[in-house]
């Protein structure tokens, strides 16, 4: 028997590291060694790939990739609909890190918060979305898929040939996800485009509007979601902006968390966190508006009386508030038929599909990641039937839900359309998974230039000996000050963990607790007009009618302990938590910017 060779501790450590990497199936490059949380592991050599195995043309990063262990028992691939973005080069990441350390933050004017859709998407340019190429029933499935792959590669080539990577925003490079959109549009009678009211221009691609209303001849309903996170005057201003530029739109205001009008909703107010109990989903604002829009579109071709009766039952149940537990609520409500679509259902059906077949209207829900598509379906159903998460890309395949026997909802995975938006704004819009960001500091700087983060969070400059003295801030200083305030330290050297602090600040922004709201063009000059508009007062009253009046709702002062922060950083599903959270304003600080301070009620020793 050969003699055993010595095996050092260093070799054993290396062996365990390699084993962990193989087990996790890390397809992406690891974080840069300069990250405070990534330790000494070097990032792997960048891999290039495309969504369907065609010739390698661009650097692709697959987000939230799971270990490759083959197909599941039902042939399900968990990585099939993962987000695929163009990878940032190492040079670009390092350049942005240097800028975060060197560039002094300068507050921007209110006019700089105004976004015009013409500047974001440039309608008529190559910033389109991929269309399904022509096909016939004589083609085999393999021929059709090969044709779609070639067409998709040509689509990517046109975009990357017209714009540089630095100018382009993140957008979806996964053909499988675009196929989901094609199928949803083909099977839908009415299309809902869900947007976030804080930045609806970001989530509204004009190319999709032209395709749905023009080529397909379908009705498009624009849902301005999360209206509780923006001042009512701004909501009304955005509604009129889209009506003016896109007259064929049907616009609906929606939120799953309507606010109590007894508390102020002005920007700059302090937030408390409240937990929705019992029939929380039945308090959604907007189902009645959506029903009226669908009635105007179908003009009597579909019997929607059962939907109206359901809304009346939900409103009555929410007003009584006689159910205290979520389990009782789910047992008490009628069953919802859920159909998970398979590959056979993804086969093309042709543009000549019969509308309102068998007296059923199919409503397709499309939009960007993290705009609240799944929450909207939960709000329409009246209870939780769809898993929701703060992490974009959570919906991995589309399912259909029968709201009533004559109304079918279809949930599509989120899609990012190509645009010219700054990538920092996309991160703040929740489009890019925060846990996967290689360089979060410039996004924090983008936020701090538009809302007074340092004042709202009572941050002290890291180099300031005198708290009353003025010091120039850079993005790195903001992150370091927040790490010092929260006690975020690295494991070995106990330095301020600026990477974790930056992620924490970005999560506060995405969750709406540091709310950055963009404005339509001309809003700054006409702000007083919109605040006194009749629809603004009507919106405030409508939120009051569905607000917390007698239902079980608990409010707790937000202290954001380290343990609570860790739960947020793990991106747990709302299903696992068993209850939803919303932020409730409690006082107005008079700030002119749409930012809320959840820490103003805390003393120095409590932070």
Swiss-Prot record:
Keyword flag Nucleotide-binding: yes
Binding positions for GTP per the UniProt entry: 225-228, 367-374, 411-415
GO biological process, one term: DNA damage response
Pfam families in UniProt: MMR_HSR1
CP-type G domain: residues covered: 178-418
Membrane-spanning parts: none
Annotated GO MF terms: GTP binding; GTPase activity
Ranges where the record places region Disordered: 1-81, 544-607
Comp. bias regions, Basic and acidic residues: 15-26
This protein's UniProt keywords: GTP-binding, Nucleotide-binding, Phosphoprotein
Bias (Basic residues): 1-14
Positions carrying Phosphoserine: 32-34, 51, 68, 324, 561-563
InterPro entries: G_CP_dom, GNL1-like, GTP-bd, P-loop_NTPase
Phosphothreonine carried by residues: 48, 50
Residue ranges, compositional bias (Acidic residues): 550-585
Annotated family: Belongs to the TRAFAC class YlqF/YawG GTPase family.
Notes on the domains: In contrast to other GTP-binding proteins, this family is characterized by a circular permutation of the GTPase motifs described by a G4-G1-G3 pattern.
Summary of the function given for this chain in its UniProt record: Possible regulatory or functional link with the histocompatibility cluster.
Descriptive protein name: Guanine nucleotide-binding protein-like 1
Gene source species: Rattus norvegicus
Gene assigned in the entry: Gnl1
